[in-house]
Amino acid sequence: GNLDARRDWGHARDYVEGMWRILQQETPDDYVLATGETHSVRGFASRAFAAAGIELDWKGEGLAEKGVDAASGEIRVEIDPRYFRPAEVDLLMGDAAKARERLGWTHTRDLDSLVGEMVAADLELLGREGLPRAERMA
């Protein structure tokens, strides 16, 4: 997919807290729960590999761009055109000002802690179950 796409990633625990606060209101209303920060898919991938102890070097451009393990030279990330969205939105970012002002809600976890938690959970699962079935069959 598009490594340049920028997204507003946030932690589910923060969003559940926001939803709970919304449900406590006397009058129903619409709220946006978001971090107000964007990060590229490339940056997310770099953070995820770093959390697993792998530094990526990005080489090439466009469809030929690859994330290469800086230590081993092994290709870790390749672009697959099947994952490009037909109507790609380059930037998705929310404005949670209303939730902050009326609910006192704001996100409390940054992207690095989110990515670290996700990678740790995957590494734990990998340690318990080994490679996913599709990887074993390859």
Give the predicted meaning of each segment.
Residues G1-A138:
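C-terminal substrate-binding subdomain of Rossmann-fold SDR/epimerase-dehydratase oxidoreductases
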